[in-house]
Amino acid sequence: LSRRQRQMCIRDRISVWSVLELDNKKMKINEWPRHGIQALWAALTNSHVSGFVTGKIYTGKLKNVCVPGLNCYSCPGAAGACPVGAFQAVVGSSKFRFSYYITGILILFGVLLGRFICGFLCPFGWFQELLHKIPSPKLSTKKLKPLRYLKYAVLLVMVVLLPLLAVNELGMGDPFFCKYLCPQGVLEGALPLSLTNAGIRAALGKLFTWKACILLAVIMGSVVFYRPFCKWLCPLGAFYALLNKVSLFQMRVDTHKCVSCGACARACKMDVDITKTPNHAECIRCGMCMKACPTDAIQYKFGLGDQSNTETTKE
């Protein structure tokens, strides 16, 4: 038999196997090594532990450094700044050198890692994944794909345009996303601070109630949907998604090994078929497709150029 014929035979056999066994295999895929990295990074990002006791926000030199993931500046344990909040504050004025730093560091993160940051280095993404592990009926988001474009609207309107246009006398932008939409601000900021600070408890009002409702909706949604905030509303994920295809950290599909069984597409919780678009904007590099692949055709790669050949074998 020719190589093409052998590949087709293997594909047919594995296709049968994947249909019968993939659901069981998905249940056995071990995600805890990645969750371990997520937990470690969340701990490092919020390593100012004394803040949780004193109810005070850390304001040291490290707070001038942006972390790559969505982590609230106002979290009493936060050792670094949230890139979204920092960008909103300075986007309205070029007189702040800090604005160039924020923009540059975001682009650097995106070009180096893309949405690998979402899959490994975002505390709020990890939080949603843990909620999704709660035993309950799970719903697919494949039919809700149009909602993924909402996060780009959030990025454009709430993170760029409104802070750019609505600036104070000092040239500082109003952080619309942080104030009116971000649930991480309630989870990491308002809630822990209010537990130890009576003044903050007394100041909580309608805006807190609104954002608490958003957080509750995200929590409930995360139990049945996989990472709904990441898919539909996160502006930081939207920014990294724009750079996913050109980032140095990419996914590679070896078409000589790929047998088009579809196991990777069925395993992907971000609704991506990696054999068609290895570096899709929604791919968070979680590695589920790699572990589901029966022929080890999918790999991580780091470097210039997209070496993936996405042409899969067809009859």
Task: Tell me what each language-model feature is.
Residues 1-12:
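Single conserved hydrophobic/aromatic residue that forms the stacking wall/gate
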Residues 15-275, 281-315:
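Non-ligating segments of multi-cofactor redox enzymes
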